[in-house]
Amino acid sequence: MKKEFLWGGALSNVQAEGGYLEDGKGLNVYDTLVVTPEPTDVATDHYHHWKEDIDYMAEMGFKAYRFSVVWSRIHPLGNEEKPNEKGLDFYDKMVDYLLEKGIEPVVSLVHFDMPDYLLNHYNGFMNKEVIEFYARHVESIVERFKGKVKYYITYNEINLAIHMSDLVSGARLPEGMTKQEMFVHLNVNVQVAHARAVEVIKRVDPQAQVGGMIGHAPFYPLTCKADDILAADFKNKMHNYFVYDTMCNGELPQYFMQYAKNRNIELNMSQEEKDVIKDASKKLDYLAFSYYRSNVISSFEDIKDQNELEDALIFDQRSLKNPYYDANEWGWQIDADGLRYSLVDFYHRYHKPLFIVENGIGIDETMKDGKVYDDERIAYYQKHIKAINTAVEHDGVDLMGYLAWSPIDFLSSHKEIRKRYGFVYVDRDFEDLKELKRYPNHKGKI
């Protein structure tokens, strides 16, 4: 690994902070997401424990830490002209403390935290006005962090915009619109949003590095039948490659435009939007992704119409099992080889530095005798770190860094505390917040 390799961890602040409506923060789409009756307004109280949590990161030898600036803490409604200074001050102090501890901040600019007002009054990124609200939000952050933050990620797991639309893109299916139309329009709009963010970052702080990010899980064909191979190829293109193809080549890929054409869907892109995507592709510094698992997929033998088959594959919810890999209790396949495969695949396709900005395993853990025994997670990390070492040293992949998910416990994207990822155990359960005391796990010593 390079001397400047960015070892560390990553966290979604909206899932950890709490500080529900403190210091001018507004409601966001994660706050209002109703999945479980679990109390989420405190989360794991990172808002009041952030120094303690960063101290643990320093003890573990972190060289980098990725966090997200909660949009609704900076622009409570999302459409304000001026940012909330108390919100900016909170993250500014965090950046300064990280630098004091020798930890490089990596900042995500939207991560499940769009102001709820933009969902309910604009339908999020389905509305092009929201792209400009987002660009204003990005400018507020970069102006404040200029000269201190070197690395930005424009949009967390942008390829999931349609599949977790309320949470990832603040959007719901409009009345009278098909989900295929929403798939096309929303994917185009978030690509424009990413490109606008790149433009703002490079204009405000030309020395900063900016990357685009996907939530990656490679799709393997279930069998060696040609139909299954074609199904996996199509799924990978639309789920994994579309984003990077657009970001790196500066235009929508032919297969995406053909998908729209086959369904008589107008792309509705202005020349200005095409230009900003093209310009951003020339300025993008690296490609980031999360990796937890691989998937398998098969064709649908009973569907003969090609359009229907493609739509079934895009919105497939079958969760087919791979017989060659174990899974955690949520059914996520543990496949370290898939991480090496992904690194080699992306690097040979795009020839840009890569950055693993999330990798970890969710486990239902409890304390025993005041300790958390974490052999299962340690084994997971050992396998995945070995895989990335092979990708770098043997396959020649240019890898910037590896950020584990995650330094501390937090609520999952579905607001569960039971699904834990943290290097540091936070003592609370489903109903009882207890004292939110921190306990370092064995895994903090990996």
Which functions belong to the PLM regions below?
Residues 26-55:
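Aromatic- and Gly/Pro-rich amphipathic surface segment
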Residues 40, 47, 78-81, 329:
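Short, flexible active-site loop motifs that bind/organize anionic cofactors or intermediates
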Residues 60-88, 107-110:
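Aromatic-lined carbohydrate-binding/catalytic grooves of carbohydrate-active enzymes
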